[in-house]
Swiss-Prot record:
Subunit organization: Homodimer. Interacts with PRE3 and ASK7.
BP-aspect Gene Ontology terms: brassinosteroid mediated signaling pathway; regulation of DNA-templated transcription
Localization terms from the record: Nucleus
Record domain bHLH: where: 135-184
Gene it is expressed from: BHLH150
Its job: Atypical bHLH transcription factor probably unable to bind DNA. Negatively regulates brassinosteroid signaling.
Region (Disordered) residue spans: 1-23
Entry GO CC: nucleus
Protein name (Swiss-Prot/TrEMBL): Transcription factor bHLH150
PANTHER family the UniProt entry points to: TRANSCRIPTION FACTOR BHLH150, TRANSCRIPTION FACTOR IBH1-LIKE 1
Gene Ontology molecular function: DNA-binding transcription factor activity; protein dimerization activity; transcription cis-regulatory region binding
Post-translational modification: Phosphorylated by ASK7.
Length: 211
């Protein structure tokens, strides 16, 4: 990456070339594994040990596997190199996370089909709060009716926090929420480890500071 910066080329737009042949995506991933995979595995191992001290109730096991974190980290590293300047790290990280989930859940499919990740997060962060405030102001009737209304409002708030689950039945909503939380925890661990590795290998690059 340092040689590309010295030549004045943009690593996010120019393809990686070896001789006269463009290096395919699979080979770039393999090269990335050889460069920093050992350090990545060690960092992920340490983060996984520390995370195991916290309760793991209702968390999806697939996101706790070191292999999933390794695959996500390598895909994220390659995506950040190829991303446009207008794309934020958060948007790229969320899209790679949804791609890693392979569209097996509602939240991952919602992120993949969303054209505006920022507006999606804005709706996810602001509307639940306004809905909760309206529920508090408009609660009335008998005690049992107020209790049922409060439960329904909380379910709607929870559905607004998870992408693609605004109108999902409660049992499926709980499963989606558990999987989404586990995926976000894995994302934090992987991005933290990747940021440390990039800062050690290339302390002067903008990619490490952006994470």
């Amino acid at each position: 990456m340092s040689s590309e910066q010295g030549n004045g080329s943009n690593p996010s737009t120019s393809p990686e070339v070896e001789g006269t042949k463009t290096i395919p995506f699979r080979r770039r991933l393999q090269r990335g594994q050889r460069v920093f995979a050992p350090k990545l595995m060690e960092a992920l191992r340490r983060s996984r040990v520390s995370s195991e001290e916290a309760p793991v109730r209702h968390l999806s096991r697939r996101w706790r596997a070191t292999t999933a974190q390794k695959v996500y980290s390598l895909k994220l590293y390659d995506a950040l190199q190829r991303s446009r300047r207008s794309a934020t790290v958060r948007d790229t990280a969320d899209k790679v996370l949804a791609t890693t989930a392979r569209g097996a859940t509602r939240w991952s499919r919602a992120i993949l089909v969303s054209r505006f990740g920022t507006s999606l997060r804005r709706r996810r962060n602001t509307k639940p709060a306004s809905a909760l405030a309206a529920a508090i102001r408009g609660s009335g009737g008998s005690g049992r009716r107020r209790k049922l209304s409060a439960v329904g409002n909380r379910v709607r708030v929870l559905g607004g926090l998870v992408p693609g689950c605004r109108r999902t039945a409660l049992p499926e909503l709980l499963d989606e929420t558990a999987d989404y939380i586990a995926a976000l925890e894995m994302q934090v661990r992987a991005m933290t480890a990747l940021s440390k590795i990039l800062s050690e290998l290339q302390p002067s690059t903008n990619l490490g500071s952006a994470l």
